[in-house]
């Protein structure tokens, strides 16, 4: 929660999340959610992460937006979930994540693909809002007509 917690300088440097860092869910109750990821895309504000998350620091050249979509793809998710271990709680380790093979196109292609997927997500969100508005309008009209 932004602005609601304080960290020592040592904690802040150890748990700091910056633009381009990748965050992986360490543990899950089901196989499908094990190792789900997100990429920190705020370029202006750093944040902190907790103990149930594995942070991958941005060390090489990659487009963070592209990585966000790549890590959510079915082929990468399959690699991660296939390697996850556990019975009651399914866990993913840093070693597991290090073994995931990523096919990285050129930076130019990464930037283009990331923007295409972002645009598609924005269109989906816009149409979902319109759909919800139409459903609510229909419901309201039905309620008024058949009182």
Predicted features, each with a name:
Residues 1-147:
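Feature detects amphipathic, helix-rich regulatory segments
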